[in-house]
């Protein structure tokens, strides 16, 4: 009898590093997690220590093996998924970062982005990278490090510095500096990668003064990039065989590998991705065009829309409004009333994301009458998550011409049955909640497992994407459209608040 083998997924997130071990049936055998420090040097700036990221990630790997009593020679391969856009620059001779990692949330490069717009590069960037000009992406962060760290520019020109997103840094460290690589999904979030040619965009690198020698080699999301030694020299050599950015890994973990398949991750915000296959769709409706994973981990195209306030609006009800003691109670109170009684909550606390991209919109409650109580406001807040999701899905359908047949969902808020049913009603499609909540780790594990032959193909994996529950739409069309029109009016109110201020 052959000894049982396992796949490890390393899930390097914004607040914690996790390691997840899966068996051949894609069951989770063991999980280990460690949080790390969030550094805020100035208002709007966010950093991490790259050495702490690596230390927490490597220790969770050792911990989770020990916890499950699994030896390192039983690991068939390692898959990596990571927070996207976060930028690390290090010296390849010393292995030391020249500065902290600049995190995706960091807004310090807003001025550089304005200059790119003034230089008339907005359309070129959208057409060739699929992205909007924003501090969110890596390109302007690399430039900031080279411009502001003493000696960095000279070392970069001399070929001594390397750039990487978090996946690249982890692989470089795990292979003792032998492998400098990223995958298409992470490269597509840098704002300097051309998604038409699948090469680094030399025009944009030149514009930002970034030497090409710093950039990692870009490969597919499912192949053996190198090996790591667990247990030091003479230890077990394990192939690192899968890499994908967190949202693309979740899309793959949900088995959305064909054109028109879509998923929504309900976290602090909501991340919607729709696979558009080999067809690159340039959005005219405020979405990003990005790279995802095709059936074998090869590059395929996707549309992405981010909603800023998903689960965060429930936290607001709990922490600021004190309407809930526990976020889980929101479902109970929302179902105590039959409707929201004409109330709409637009949680534009930090502006509105896709498809509006309105930084000046502000949170708004409209439609209040004397009969409205706290339960109506709780219900309307939950409903806002579903309405914002529909805003993005409508934009995706308009851009791609593809009609959504069903939506696969994951993330913390999917445990709320009221929200999932309302989501199905608002979209008029079935909503499928997966049984495994760890879909991001699952995606990374699948990509690695396919590359090393742990799983033979997609047919084998499709059986593992088990649905916990499907929610079917109930509303009649007139009621659905009437409610959604009300939401659109409420959004206009949230947007006009700043406009009215300008008129004063």
UniProtKB/Swiss-Prot annotation:
In the record, biological process GO terms are: glycerol catabolic process; glycerol metabolic process; glycerol-3-phosphate metabolic process
Query: Which residues does the annotation say bind sn-glycerol 3-phosphate?
Result: 14, 84-85, 136, 246
Give details on activation and inhibition: Inhibited by fructose 1,6-bisphosphate (FBP).
Q: What class of enzyme is it?
A: transferase
Q: Which GO terms describe its molecular function?
A: ATP binding; glycerol kinase activity
Q: Which Gene3D superfamilies match?
A: 3.30.420.40
**UniProt-listed InterPro entries:** ATPase_NBD, Carb_kinase_FGGY, Carb_kinase_FGGY_CS, FGGY_C, FGGY_N, Glycerol_kin
Xref: NCBIfam families: glycerol_kin (TIGR01311), PRK00047.1 (NF000756)
Q: Which family does it belong to?
A: Belongs to the FGGY kinase family.
Q: What is this protein called?
A: Glycerol kinase
